[in-house]
Structure formats: C-alpha cells, structure tokens
C-alpha cells in the first residue's frame, strides 16, 4: 500500500446525458429530429412543449417545438465520447456550470457517425451532462431524505479536473 488510495465515494461519474434538438416548430421537422435521436440513442425521444407564446418566432404556448432523450450508463459515455470527438476534445470554461455539470452543442448530427439520409436532413443538437458522486441519491429519494454536504457536492473545478484527466482534453479560457 505505497500509493495513497482514493475514496471511492469521492469519484465523479456521469449520472446522465441529455440530448436535445430544438426545432422551433411542430410538424414534419420535429418528427425527423425525433428519428435522428432514436437512431443515435436507441431510445424513444420525448417531445417538449413551448412554455409561452413568442409571436416574433411564430411559437404558441404548449406547441411541441423540441425533442430530447435522456441516456444513462455506458451508452451515455459512448455517445459523449463521440460528441467530444466532434468538438476535438476542447470545451470552453463557460461550458461548465457552478454545480459541476457541463454542456455543449454540435452543428451537424452526421459528424457523430450517423449515415446521412436525404429524407431526414441535417440537425444540430445540444449535449447536457449531469455529473454526480455516489451518495447523491439521499437528496432525491422519498424516504429518509437528507442534504448533501458542501464538501461532497460537485463543483466546477472538480468537473474540469475530471474532464481533463478522463478525456485528456483542453478547457479554453475564452
């Protein structure tokens, strides 16, 4: 035991990856975006509604304008790896939130390795990654709920250090 062992409860892990395609209108484009997410994740995406009416964009309240899917486990890590490859393993400092989560967007879904289909077209998408530590469930469970201590919460610095070490990536200060 010459090397100091890390506490396994302090290790960061990916809790979930949320893929979002915001189309801005309901109809055919929304169903095509749904097909893209289904091809990528292998799961059925959920449609999101507009929260309020924006007349300049032609969006009405409760109109379905986006699709998203939540991926967990090894599949989330595999999709994240493909997304980071598109971004060349470089993210900006502002991509990381103060709560330790991070996100980024890509311009074209075909960069992820999905074959181009002329009937679907090309869509960009957002990646949102929620980070956590073992033991975070105590704040969300129904029975015997408790608070997570400040030293155990994920911070921006922790996530950036994990990101650099895990993916051998760069975080730009732009």
From Swiss-Prot:
Q: Which domain of life is it from?
A: Eukaryota
**Role:** Component of the ribosome, a large ribonucleoprotein complex responsible for the synthesis of proteins in the cell. The small ribosomal subunit (SSU) binds messenger RNAs (mRNAs) and translates the encoded message by selecting cognate aminoacyl-transfer RNA (tRNA) molecules. The large subunit (LSU) contains the ribosomal catalytic site termed the peptidyl transferase center (PTC), which catalyzes the formation of peptide bonds, thereby polymerizing the amino acids delivered by tRNAs into a polypeptide chain.
Family annotation (InterPro entries): Ribosomal_uL5 (IPR002132), Ribosomal_uL5_C (IPR031309), Ribosomal_uL5_CS (IPR020929), Ribosomal_uL5_dom_sf (IPR022803), Ribosomal_uL5_N (IPR031310)
Task: From the UniProt record, list the coiled-coil ranges.
Answer: none
Annotated localization: Nucleus; Cytoplasm
Q: Does the keyword rRNA-binding apply?
A: yes
The residue ranges crossing the membrane are none
Gene Ontology, cellular component aspect: cytoplasm; fungal biofilm matrix; nucleus; ribonucleoprotein complex; ribosome
rRNA-binding listed as a keyword: yes
Q: Which GO terms describe its molecular function?
A: rRNA binding; structural constituent of ribosome
Provide the family line.
Belongs to the universal ribosomal protein uL5 family.
PROSITE patterns in the cross-refs: RIBOSOMAL_L5
Signal sequence region: none
Pfam name, any one:
Ribosomal_L5_C
Query: Per its UniProt record, what NCBIfam families does this chain match?
Result: PRK04219.1 (NF003258)
Q: Name one GO biological process term.
A: translation
Q: Which PANTHER family match?
A: 60S RIBOSOMAL PROTEIN L11-RELATED
**Which coarse location class applies to the principal site listed for this UniProt protein?**
nucleus
Keyword terms, alphabetized: Cytoplasm, Nucleus, Ribonucleoprotein, Ribosomal protein, RNA-binding, rRNA-binding
Q: What is this protein called?
A: Large ribosomal subunit protein uL5
């Amino acid at each position: 035991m010459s090397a100091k062992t890390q506490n396994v409860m302090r290790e960061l892990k990916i809790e979930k990856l949320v893929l979002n395609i915001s189309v801005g209108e309901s109809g055919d484009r929304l169903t095509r975006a749904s097909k893209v997410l289904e091809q990528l994740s292998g799961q059925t995406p959920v449609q999101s509604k507009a929260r309020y009416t924006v007349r300049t964009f032609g969006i009405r309240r409760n109109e379905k304008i986006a699709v998203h899917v939540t991926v967990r486990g090894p599949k989330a890590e595999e999709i994240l790896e493909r997304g980071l490859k598109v971004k060349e393993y470089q993210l900006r400092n502002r991509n990381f939130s103060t709560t330790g989560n991070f996100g980024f967007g890509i311009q074209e879904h075909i960069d992820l390795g999905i074959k181009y289909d002329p009937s679907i077209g090309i869509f960009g998408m957002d990646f949102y990654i929620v980070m956590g530590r073992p033991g975070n469930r105590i704040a969300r469970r129904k029975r015997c709920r408790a608070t997570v201590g400040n030293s155990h919460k994920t911070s921006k610095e922790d996530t950036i250090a994990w990101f650099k070490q895990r993916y051998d990536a760069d975080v730009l200060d732009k």
